């Protein structure tokens, strides 16, 4: 873990009370016992399903980081009533302490057993397995192709620490042209207390769901008529996006970057040169023909920055060159994987590319780490998980350059003082990289920033610079994204704040609540003053009673509600209610203006006025 100790801004309490003592919820990959429990529970579920639904054919049933699932080919979808019946069947199996045993068989024996059970999907799985073939039996009547591991018997599973959570559609092998299956998701833990904490966190995650908040606060939408995965930013959301972009640009100018704007499409020949058609074609939208030339929407900004570099002769004296762009890219995503702002087909990537000398790598990476911390901490992301991925077996590039690049990344992380894990051999074939995950207010980790060295594109595009001795040399190219996708970051940020955005970022910062018609002119005058001061303010002109005015403002999560009555109008003041700080009492208009301007300039969470 790394990053400052400053705590994330708190938001409204969860609807379900947290336990008095914290309950640790390990991931499956962090606990060998939990892995066995969840893997075994998926088998128990499959056995219970086939006992209740003899026509159901089994496919695969792996563990996940928070539970397990199993995909079934069944004539009908599973209902809520079915899940309850399946759970009862699972409890019976658990209580019987049925043994799970590993058995090695020949391929012919496995094929005979599979055909006897009429399990066509298992037959297909068998074709891809290498000898020896292992089965796990669950009692005498049920078995599955499986490498394990599992618990010794079902009595080691806690019947009070699991739940069947939901049903979803899936395709065999993830291929939409193949059979549609029915997936049952479940979760399993060692103790009932862990299950209760898991449920509480799920409930809290639902409360924070950016899709619901985006609709409630009128921030964005995805319109079916336009197409899946294409985001419409509404005025309130667009205002927030503009604030984020303005801060991003300012931070980059101060960090020594210049900005680029590049096209949304390019001739197909560019994508051939870059290698995208060889390695990324499935994620690209198909070509369009214009004036007898084929064009494709860009899935990445990198080749455009490379062409900009290649547009003129470069000298070593110019390096490092730092270019950044908020570039809209388009990637084909299958219908089943799109999710709100988190997974879309058109999004804005905050791409930057640094072209530098080999000896400049460490300094440039450190500058990127500093800029990353500055930007992420402004949105109250202060705890990071960092992975350094090194050279894989199959790679391109000179050994000395790989060593220099990897040492440069390590040196920068050490100079920054950030802890990191090394993923040996986990880098791309064209260079080592740093991946940074951010932790949100409820402990979830999100992949966010990436720093990637690239020895591939400079070679493909024959990039060079004139060295001090007059020779032509290849520059080092560093890809870098801090937000990654701006849309995805907006979704993560929204869930982190639960829609209670800090004052500087809120789409509507102050709402004026005149309690009578007589004070309306005063409210209009105050609105002008706030607007002139750069404060995003509105007046509620509905004429509702004060209680409803306040409730409406709170539902829209307005940071500051300013109540205006006759007394406030006479005193050139307002009565302030802050979502963050509660009742602030009566404040002079001059004090409100001063506090709001200061909060905006400092990108502060609240007004800083004391009640």
From Swiss-Prot:
Region named Disordered: 1-25
InterPro entries: aa-tRNA-synt_IIb, aa-tRNA-synth_II, aa-tRNA-synth_II/BPL/LPL, Anticodon-bd, Anticodon-bd_dom_sf, Thr-tRNA-ligase_IIa, Thr/Ala-tRNA-synth_IIc_edit, ThrRS_anticodon
Highest taxon in the source lineage: Bacteria
Compartment(s) where it occurs, according to its Swiss-Prot or TrEMBL record: Cytoplasm
Catalytic reaction list: tRNA(Thr) + L-threonine + ATP = L-threonyl-tRNA(Thr) + AMP + diphosphate + H(+)
Major subcellular site: cytoplasm
Entry annotated with the keyword Nucleotide-binding: yes
Pfam family, one: HGTP_anticodon
SMART domains reported in the protein's UniProt record: tRNA_SAD
Molecular function terms from GO: ATP binding; metal ion binding; threonine-tRNA ligase activity; tRNA binding
GO cellular component: cytoplasm
UniProt region (Catalytic), positions on chain: 209-502
SUPFAM superfamilies membership: Class II aaRS ABD-related (SSF52954), Class II aaRS and biotin synthetases (SSF55681), ThrRS/AlaRS common domain (SSF55186)
UniProt cofactor note: Binds 1 zinc ion per subunit.
GO BP: any one term: threonyl-tRNA aminoacylation
Gene3D superfamilies named in the record: 3.30.54.20, Anticodon-binding domain (3.40.50.800), Bira Bifunctional Protein, Domain 2 (3.30.930.10), Threonyl-trna Synthetase, Chain A, domain 2 (3.30.980.10)
Binding site for Zn(2+): 302, 353, 479
Similarity comment text for this entry: Belongs to the class-II aminoacyl-tRNA synthetase family.
The protein's name: Threonine--tRNA ligase
Organism this protein belongs to: Parasynechococcus marenigrum (strain WH8102)
Source species taxonomy: Bacteria, Bacillati, Cyanobacteriota, Cyanophyceae, Synechococcales
């Amino acid at each position: 873990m790394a990053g400052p100790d400053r705590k994330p801004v708190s938001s409204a309490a969860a609807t379900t009370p947290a336990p008095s003592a914290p309950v640790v919820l390990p991931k499956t990959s962090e606990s060998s016992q939990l892995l066995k429990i969840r893997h075994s529970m998926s088998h128990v579920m499959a056995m219970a399903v086939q006992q209740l639904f003899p026509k159901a054919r089994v496919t695969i049933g792996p563990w996940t980081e928070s539970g397990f699932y199993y995909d079934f080919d069944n004539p009908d979808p599973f209902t809520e009533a079915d899940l309850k019946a399946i759970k009862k069947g699972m409890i019976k199996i658990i209580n019987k302490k049925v043994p799970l045993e590993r058995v090695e068989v020949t391929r012919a024996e496995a094929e005979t057993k599979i055909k006897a059970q009429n399990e066509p999907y298992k037959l297909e799985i068998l074709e891809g397995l290498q000898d020896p073939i292992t089965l796990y039996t669950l009692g005498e009547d049920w078995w599955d192709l499986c490498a394990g591991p599992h618990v010794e018997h079902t009595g080691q599973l806690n019947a009070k620490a699991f739940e069947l959570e939901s049903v979803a559609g899936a395709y065999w092998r993830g291929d939409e042209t193949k059979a549609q299956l029915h997936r049952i998701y479940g979760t399993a833990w060692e103790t009932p207390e862990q299950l209760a904490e898991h449920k509480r966190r799920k409930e809290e995650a639902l409360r924070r769901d950016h899709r619901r908040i985006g609709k409630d606060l009128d921030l964005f939408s995805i319109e079916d008529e336009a197409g899946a995965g294409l985001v419409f930013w509404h005025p309130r959301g667009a205002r927030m996006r503009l604030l984020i972009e303005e801060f991003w640009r300012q931070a980059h100018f101060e960090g020594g970057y210049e900005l680029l704007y590049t096209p949304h499409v390019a001739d197909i020949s560019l994508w051939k040169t870059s290698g995208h058609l060889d390695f990324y074609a499935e994620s690209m939208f198909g070509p369009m023909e214009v004036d007898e030339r084929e064009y494709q929407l860009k899935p990445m900004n990198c080749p455009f920055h490379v062409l900009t570099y290649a547009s003129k002769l470069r000298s070593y004296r110019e390096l490092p060159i730092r270019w950044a762009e908020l570039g809209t890219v388009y990637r084909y995503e299958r219908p089943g994987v799109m999710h709100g702002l988190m997974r879309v087909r058109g999004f804005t990537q905050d791409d930057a590319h640094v072209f530098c000398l080999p000896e400049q790598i460490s300094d440039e990476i450190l500058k990127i780490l500093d800029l990353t911390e500055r930007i992420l901490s402004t949105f109250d992301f202060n705890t990071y998980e960092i992975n350094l991925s090194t050279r894989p077996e199959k790679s391109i590039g000179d050994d000395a350059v790989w060593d220099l690049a990897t040492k440069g990344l390590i040196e920068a992380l050490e100079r920054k003082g950030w802890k990191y894990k090394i993923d040996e051999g986990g880098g791309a074939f064209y260079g080592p990289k740093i991946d940074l995950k951010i932790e949100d207010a409820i402990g979830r980790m999100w992949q966010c920033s990436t720093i990637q060295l690239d020895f591939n594109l400079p070679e493909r595009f024959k990039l060079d610079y004139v060295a001090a001795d007059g020779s032509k040399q290849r520059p080092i190219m560093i890809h870098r994204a801090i937000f990654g996708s701006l849309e995805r970051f907006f979704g993560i940020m929204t869930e982190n704040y639960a829609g209670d955005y800090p004052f500087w970022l809120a789409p509507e910062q102050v709402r004026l609540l005149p309690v009578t018609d007589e004070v309306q002119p005063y409210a209009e005058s105050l609105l002008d003053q706030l607007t002139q001061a750069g404060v995003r303010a509105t007046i509620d002109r509905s004429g509702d009673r004060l209680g409803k005015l306040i409730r409406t403002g709170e539902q829209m999560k307005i940071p500051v509600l300013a109540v205006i009555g006759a007394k406030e109008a006479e005193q050139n003041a307002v009565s302030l209610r802050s979502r963050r700080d509660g009742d602030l009492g009566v404040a002079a208009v001059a004090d409100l203006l001063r506090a709001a301007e200061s909060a905006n300039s400092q990108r502060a969470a609240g007004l800083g006025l004391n009640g």
